Structure formats: C-alpha cells, structure tokens
Amino acid sequence: MKEQQHIFTNKMLRTLLIPVIFEQVLNSLMGTVDTMMVSNVGSAAISAVSLVDSINVLVIQAFSALAAGGAILCSQYIGQKNHEMANKSARQVLFIIIAISVAVTALCLLFRVPLLKLIFGKVESDVMTASQVYFFYTALSFPFIALYDAGASIFRSQGNTRGPMTVSVISNVINIGGNAALIWGFNMGVAGAAIATLASRVFCAVVVLWQLRMDRQPIVVRNYRQIRPDGKMIRRVLALGIPSGIENSMFQLGKLAIQSSVSTLGTVAIAAQAMTNILENLNGIAAIGVGIGLMTVVGQCLGAGRKDEAVYYIKKLSVLAEIIVVASCLLVFVLTIPVTKLGGMESESARMCFHMISWITVVKPIVWTLAFIPAYGLRAAGDVKFSMITSCITMWTFRFCLCVYLIRFRGFGPMAVWIGMFTDWTVRGIVFSLRFHSRKWLKHKVV
C-alpha cells in the first residue's frame, strides 16, 4: 500500500504526534519541577509531594479516561464527517467532567485528613503535615485540570494537537515561575508548589474553553451555561469512559497500595522511590504521547470504515514508540546521577534511585511498548472492557501481590516495586499482542 493511499500521510502523522509528545513531556516536567524544587526543602517535603501526587494522579487519570471516552466518539464521528454528532458528544463530555470533578473536589476537601491517614498510615508527622497542606491546594485544581483534559481530548480527536501543546508550554512557564517565587522567594515550601500548580491549571482550563469557541475547527462549543444533559449521549460516553476510568483508577489504586508498603521502609526509601517514579515516567512519557495520538488515528480510520488502516497504524506507531522508549531510557540513565545531585537528594536515596533506574533501563525497552501502545488503538476501537479486565488482573496479581510479598515477607527494599512492575509489563505485553493479532477488537461498533 503506497503512502498516498493511507488516510494519514507521514507528514500528517508528524503534525499530529510531535505536539502531543511535546505536551506530554511538558506535563510530566511540571510534576518533576515541583518535586525537585521542593526536594531542597528536605526529605519530608519531597515525600509529601510524592505521596499526595499518587492520589492526585488517581483522580486525574479517572478524569482523563472519561475525556478519552468522549474523544473516541468525537474522532469516529469526525472520520464519518458527521460534525453535528461530534459537537453533541463534545458538549456532553464537558458536562460530565465538570459535574464529577466538582463533586470529587468537595469530597477531597471535606475528608482530606482522614483520607491521607487511611491511605498512608503511620508516616512521620512532618510528612503528614506537609501532605495535608499540599493536598488541600491540589484538590482545588481538580475541576480545572479536568476541564483542560476534556478540552484537549476534543481538540486531539480532530487532529489538532498544537493548541493543547501551546497551552502546556505557557502553563509550565507559569508553574516554574510560581515555584521559584513561592518556594524560594516566600519560603512557602509544599504550599508554594501546590499554589503554583493550581494557578497553571486554572490558566489551562480558561484558555482551552475559550479556544473551543473558535469557528476554525469542526467541533465548536459555545454557551457553556446552556449545556444540558443528554441521557443517551452520556450513556455512550460513559460506556467508553468508565471501563478506561476503572482501568486507570485500579492502576493508581495499586500504586497507592504499593506505596503503603514502601512507606514502611522509611523516608530514605520513600524519597528514592519518588525520584525513581519521576525518572521512569520521563523515559516513557514521550511514547505515551504516541499512544494518545494513535487513539485519534485509529478512531478516525474506523469512523471512515477503514479497518485495514487501523491495523496498519497500530503496527507503525508501535515501532515508533519502541524507538522513542529506547532513546528515552538511555537519556534518563545518563542524567540520573546529575539530576539526583541537582535535586539535593541524600546520598543513600540517590544510590538506591540509580540502582532502580539501571534495571529499568535494561527491562523497559524489552517489554513496555507491547504492554501499552497497542492498547491505545484497541480502546479507540471500543475494546475498552477487554483492556480494563486485562489490566486489572495483571496489575493486582503481579504488580501488587508480588511487590507486597517481596517487601513484607522477603525483606526487599523499594526494588520490589519494580520487580512486580516488570512482571506486570511482561504479562500485559503477551496478552495484548495476542488480542491484537486475533482481530476481535475490530468487531466493536462505536458509532
């Protein structure tokens, strides 16, 4: 098949993927900058940010999954050239997101102290105090990051990834500048980091909602106050979003459960694991950008009735993602020691971090891509329940149980987390590869 016969040319793919990859890297850097700047305040601060962010990511991933469910509908309607239904889908995504995010924020603010104590148990008192402060401000940002996720997903479903990228660039400037002023200038510690993040997320939400009003795109959303619930469309969005939301939430709940075991190892181990999580995220985030772009590509291909194209692009972009993972792992490995020194980590925490990153650099390029990238394409085809079931089983069986066993019964340190992770990745990769080659995922009808 020649390139001109494909729905997406290589140039179109570059235009789609480069901004979304760049955006994902920038979003990841926001959390990295928070942690590195706070790390100079002390181990208690970096531990607090790490612990609370594990809750924040759980909530934000659930919002992202709901937004992605709507984006699947939008992209398939765009592929069909049915812009009216794409617009209706977009309006309902925004309605669902704002309703749920406001409710979640209210619950988190009301119960933040017992929630933190329930999840993290007997952490050191200074860590718990800093965690309560950080969680208060970041919980306030949930509706804003949720609205941004919804708006950005709607833009990506149309193939417009440059707009969200531009917003992310400015948002990161706001976050970094706010961190510098509030953490170092006003000595506000974790509160300063959280307030800077809140400000950047408010900016993101306002700008993306304003951009959705423009006439230059297939999907245009105005009169936000006049959006009313459409039961049928909401059910369709939720049918795609809830399984992905459960999958993402179970994934993050597993991380929280694992974090409870890691928290028993002491502040040095918590700090080492926190920095390792950040660095591991950095060496995979660009490839995740490819996966997010793949959802748009597969959705539009299937909306246009081109199943052969969907298969072709999953293969093609999986190869691209693997190249990115290899390069990213090598880069992060080289930068690990300088980053731990720049972050002011204690020597023992830095040593443990480097040991874990060394193993990640070896294992991740072998198994990670097949475990995650094809799944984005399968979800865009509507195969969300299979992805949810597979991910939940492998995560709880291998990642969680193995990790807890190694820490609590075999005396392992934080490396146990990554042994469980590697096992999970390997099994996921095998299962999703078999599912992809079976072609059963192509039998779903989304629109």
Where would I find each of the regions flagged by the language model?
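N-terminal transmembrane alpha-helices
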Residues: Q4-M36, N40-V41, V57-G69, L73, ...
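Short alpha-helical transmembrane segments in multi-pass integral membrane proteins
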Residues: M1-V20, C74-S141, G185-I242, V298-K364, ...
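Small-residue-rich hydrophobic transmembrane alpha-helices
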Residues: I46-A106, I145-P164, I270-T336, W368-C392
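Transmembrane helical elements of multi-pass membrane transporters/channels
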Residues: T15-D34, Y137, S171, S200-C204, ...
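Helix-terminus/linker motif at the lipid-water interface of multi-pass membrane proteins
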Residues: V25, L29-S47, L116-S125, A181-M188, ...
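Residue-level hotspots within the lipid-embedded alpha helices of multi-pass solute transporters
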Residues: Q24-S28, Q61, S101, T105, ...
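Short runs within selected transmembrane alpha-helices of multi-pass transporters and secretion channels
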Residues: A67, Y137-R156, P164-N172, A193-V208, ...
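Small-residue hotspots at the loop-to-helix junctions and early N-terminal turns
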Residues: S43-S54, S131, F135, A194, ...
